[in-house]
Amino acid sequence: MQPCLVKIRRIRSGSDLPLPRYMTPHAAGMDLCADVDADLVLEPGERALVPTGIAIALPDGFEAQIRPRSGLALKHGIALVNSPGTIDPDYRGEIGVIIVNHGADAFVVRRGERIAQMVFAPFVRAELLDVDELDETARGDGGFGHTGR
């Protein structure tokens, strides 16, 4: 496992909120909490940017992926609009979570509620080579379910 030392800074009123943390010894993602001043009511079909009150500094070659929490999706229909969201290593602003309510009922985001998870991953930067043709493969250009069920 490659080490990844991440610097974190509280940038809002979140000193009463826990820093992101792993909830089990083998969890891949750290839970992020909502740093809202008042309850945020999300009606069915609505979306909102939920502040977390934190900013991070990642080492070069790493990204942070913001992902949904499965329990919120299953129980309430809460999802992330851009999943996963990507935090680049040069971004220093507050991490925000864009959520949408796909459920049938209003959903209330309360201060300190765990709303998403953050997974750290190394990445590579590709170099593109402009060519006239691509190598042939058995699959070819088949996509979008062409292999059946």
Swiss-Prot record:
Cofactor(s) the record lists: Mg(2+)
Record-level GO BP terms: dUMP biosynthetic process; dUTP catabolic process
Reaction equations catalysed: dUTP + H2O = dUMP + diphosphate + H(+)
Origin superkingdom: Bacteria
Binding site for substrate: R69, S70, G71, N82, T86, I87, D88
InterPro entries in the cross-refs: dUTPase, dUTPase-like, dUTPase-like_sf, dUTPase_trimeric
Gene3D superfamilies: 2.70.40.10
Functional pathway: Pyrimidine metabolism; dUMP biosynthesis; dUMP from dCTP (dUTP route): step 2/2
Annotated keywords: Hydrolase, Magnesium, Metal-binding, Nucleotide metabolism
Disulfide bond entries: none
EC assignment: 3.6.1.23
Molecular functions per Gene Ontology: dUTP diphosphatase activity; magnesium ion binding
Protein family (similarity comment): Belongs to the dUTPase family.
Function as written in the Swiss-Prot or TrEMBL entry: This enzyme is involved in nucleotide metabolism: it produces dUMP, the immediate precursor of thymidine nucleotides and it decreases the intracellular concentration of dUTP so that uracil cannot be incorporated into DNA.
Listed name of the protein: Deoxyuridine 5'-triphosphate nucleotidohydrolase
Source organism (scientific name): Geobacter sulfurreducens (strain ATCC 51573 / DSM 12127 / PCA)
